[in-house]
Amino acid sequence: MINKRWIVWIAAAAVFGAALAAGCQRPVQTGGLAAADASAKVYVAPGEKDEFYMFASGGFSGNVSIYGLPSGRLFAQVPVFSQYAEKGYGYSEQTKALLNTSYGFVPWDDAHHPKVSQTDGVPDGRWLFINGNNTPRIARLDLTTMETAEIIEIPNSAGNHASPFVTPNSEYVVGATRFSVPTPQKDVSIATAKENFAGLLSFIKVGAQGTMSLAFQIRMPGYSYDLAHAGKGPSAGWAFFTTYNTEQAFSLLERGASQRDKDFIAAVNWKRAEECVAQGLGVRTPASYAHNWVDDRAIAVSEMKTDSIILEPKQCTNMVFFLPTPKSPHGADVDPTGEFIVAGGKLATVLPVHSFSKMQQAIASKAFDGDANGIPILKYDATIAGEVPEPGLGPLHTEFDGKGYGYTSVFISSEIVKWSLKDFKVVDRIPTYYSIGHLMIPGGDSAKPFGKYVVALNKITKDRYLPTGPELTQSAQLYAIDGEKMRLLLDFPTVGEPHYAQAIPASLIVDKQKKFFALAENRDPMATKSEKEAKVVRKGSEVHVYMTSIRSHFSPDNIEGVQVGDTVYFHLTNLEQDWDVPHGFAITGARNSELLVMPGQTRTLVWQPERVGVFPFYCTDFCSALHQEMQGYVRVSPKGSQVKLTWNAPGTAIGAN
């Protein structure tokens, strides 16, 4: 007899296949506006600016993309975990250390979930945090410069997916193990996963200036910890993590990890965890992980850390509780009041809504249904506030509009479902094109949603854009939510694979944007603050070029006396003190990238010449009518040559020094 679960899966797969097949036909724009009306609502006139910044993860690009809403225009890409040749990020000597890990230099990661820092549960626009999923890391971006300021590696973890969700006053960002592994690592059979694998929940402290430090970790059963959100209001001091694969399968998880009707939300009382750490109940355990940050000289530095504090739920009681949740839950989303915790069960037929107040009552009355590794399992009926019936096939994530409604992304049936927090009934639904993953409402995960729009982050586009070979772009779709019914306004392509996004009013940060770096405050030891200071210095086989750039020349721009086998360091300082006048630098044969140097900034490129000859360098970033003339030459002589090291001073020919 066929198991009912398999019937559900077969039906879901059939619907999914039908949805993809429908992609070959021109879809009916159900819920959309007439083209002229939609265009008017997203049109931003020349010279005018968007209302919102949207920060979207790049997924496998490893970076963050910045868009404007409602226009959908792409403004910038911010390199985070991946080397980015356009800006020399991860190539210049001042940025390479940001990509250090306990595994060495790792110039890529899988960036999933951006989160804006918060004050009183409301986005404040100071920093943006984002996780690296592959080599477990969390990065912090400075939203005044739109640059990566810090990256911390997370030890004892694998697959940092439930991250870096922020607590209401940015006390912590969190991380969690998606792929449970032996902790500490050791050589054991994969078949002993149940006995030897563990998952860890990590709490990373955020200091007043944003500096991150690993505060403590909580050892958990070897499940897969998927997503998280912190509580707010009455649930402040708690964080909620979804788990799947409570079966602890280790092969063919699409079947093995879907046997049980319910998995869990792990409700973590991080205030209680703090108490246990203060009481000395945590065990300081050897660990190896990198902490990288940009120091006050604007140079990235790296420090290897050697231990972490690990808490055991059996020793720190009343710290963690499991809330049974159907089935393979993905999102763990807390409504603006902090009362409701919504889980999107990827294989569930309902959308469960847990009540924080009921959970507290259940804990007080010990309404337990056993335990898992010493962690109490609360009875489902004791915590559930209600279930949203017929949410669609494959509900994933929920955001909130602040007006009493939740909006849930539904992957298999490709739709957004709007439902009421009062009676848990669906009030509207609208198709997406196609296979929505995350969705985002500006501030929709906070105590004060800004509302107005919901953005669908779609995995598949099929017929939506001009084809681009075997791989098609992924997309975002903008819907208006200021009325009773959702209305499709705009499609726009995205960079990489945006798993999640955050949007905040531009007014929060637009006036705080740094326009240039004050040259007088440049503390880089390789800085050259005037053309008169430009020079070339040999130290053995190293040649250091202390160079300046200003519209429209380099100083020096002719250099002789470099030899094959030398290592040449070009320390370039941009002397400009004006907004949006970066200077680039590239030289023939460099095996790294260009430099892109902001006004008042210093960056260093390493070049190792292997051939005799004369090699040009030039500015790669257009800056003036004489941009083409912004160039120079380096003469490379044979190793051991007697050619003297010479360079030209401003306005002179070479050899005039």
Regions found by a protein language model. Give the residues of each.
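Extracytoplasmic/periplasmic copper-protein system
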Residues: K515-T548, S624-N657
